[in-house]
Amino acid sequence: MAVKVAINGFGRIGRLAFRRIQEVEGLEVVAVNDLTDDDMLAHLLKYDTMQGRFTGEVEVVDGGFRVNGKEVKSFSEPDASKLPWKDLNIDVVLECTGFYTDKDKAQAHIEAGAKKVLISAPATGDLKTIVFNTNHQELDGSETVVSGASCTTNSLAPVAKVLNDDFGLVEGLMTTIHAYTGDQNTQDAPHRKGDKRRARAAAENIIPNSTGAAKAIGKVIPEIDGKLDGGAQRVPVATGSLTELTVVLEKQDVTVEQVNEAMKNASNESFGYTEDEIVSSDVVGMTYGSLFDATQTRVMSVGDRQLVKVAAWYDNEMSYTAQLVRTLAYLAELSK
């Protein structure tokens, strides 16, 4: 029997997760909840500027959608605790609104009858933060609410883990060269949160911004908690981003070849490896959570320490979504 999934929040991540779930055997989206009307949601599901047209058939019907012949119920309920998850026998809610980002708030879905909640954002409080194929083995099935971290943390985590496991990570700085997102203005205008830089035209500027990925990494890899810091530079591309990580290593005399070999050996469905001279548009639609770029590895000795700089690509939309769906499937499997 398929795992019944509900998506709360049908924005960029919610819609792309819906698409991705259609390709995963054993998962079925049976309901979505969003305050936008069904006609608009169906249109945005079918057509996507960056990720291309949805290959399935989408039709608006009474009470929701029909997608590839299967009914998906639609709701417009602002209070998650009032959603009919019990009646629909929902196994996992994929929480994509950005509002239910701590355990207490996300608990509203459990009160409504869902068995599990996966938050598509960094979460506050005492929650497990999961980057699939980095620390998903921490899950034991007893969890009711789990965080899927951020797109940048999913890019950073496997790289940082290899450096720490193989060479010893002393400390470091990371920068995400990140595509602009919906929380930036397309034209210069006051920003809704008062951010002067995000108030500027996203497609015309390199915009310094903050990122919580360097700090959040400690929730994924406790051994390096507090060892990383960093920031973001939002750039004029709609999707396709790059994480650069510069670290001091414990091990001495490390070579570029050794670093690249370690990354290649660690590659899997979530963590790719390439020696091709790619650019950001080449990773749009990619399902690796992180793609290590061996051509950008640099090594330098500083006194008796080894300084290493590495880089990994990610589609901040689809890479992250693919990771979320892997975690969702694993979380559901543990509950059977």
Curated annotation (Swiss-Prot):
Binding-site residues, D-glyceraldehyde 3-phosphate: S150, C151, T152, T181, R198, T211, G212, R234
Pathway, per record: Carbohydrate degradation; glycolysis; pyruvate from D-glyceraldehyde 3-phosphate: step 1/5
Entry-linked InterPro entries: GlycerAld/Erythrose_P_DH (IPR020831), GlycerAld_3-P_DH_AS (IPR020830), GlycerAld_3-P_DH_cat (IPR020829), GlycerAld_3-P_DH_NAD(P)-bd (IPR020828), Glyceraldehyde-3-P_DH_1 (IPR006424), NAD(P)-bd_dom_sf (IPR036291)
Locations listed in the record: Cytoplasm
Temperature dependence: Optimum temperature is 25 degrees Celsius.
Classification via CDD domains: GAPDH_I_C, GAPDH_I_N
Binding annotation for NAD(+): R12, I13, D34, S120, N316
Enzyme class: oxidoreductase
Record GO terms (molecular function): glyceraldehyde-3-phosphate dehydrogenase (NAD+) (phosphorylating) activity; NAD binding; NADP binding
Record-marked site positions (Activates thiol group during catalysis): H178
Effect of C151S: Loss of dehydrogenase activity
Keywords assigned: Cytoplasm, Glycolysis, NAD, Nucleotide-binding, Oxidoreductase
Superkingdom to which the source organism belongs: Bacteria
Active-site residues annotated for this sequence: C151
GO BP annotations listed: glucose metabolic process; glycolytic process
Catalytic activity: D-glyceraldehyde 3-phosphate + phosphate + NAD(+) = (2R)-3-phospho-glyceroyl phosphate + NADH + H(+)
pH dependence statement: Optimum pH is 8.7.
Membership in a protein family: Belongs to the glyceraldehyde-3-phosphate dehydrogenase family.
Role description: Catalyzes the oxidative phosphorylation of glyceraldehyde 3-phosphate (G3P) to 1,3-bisphosphoglycerate (BPG) using the cofactor NAD. The first reaction step involves the formation of a hemiacetal intermediate between G3P and a cysteine residue, and this hemiacetal intermediate is then oxidized to a thioester, with concomitant reduction of NAD to NADH. The reduced NADH is then exchanged with the second NAD, and the thioester is attacked by a nucleophilic inorganic phosphate to produce BPG.
Subunit structure: Homotetramer.
UniProt protein name: Glyceraldehyde-3-phosphate dehydrogenase 1
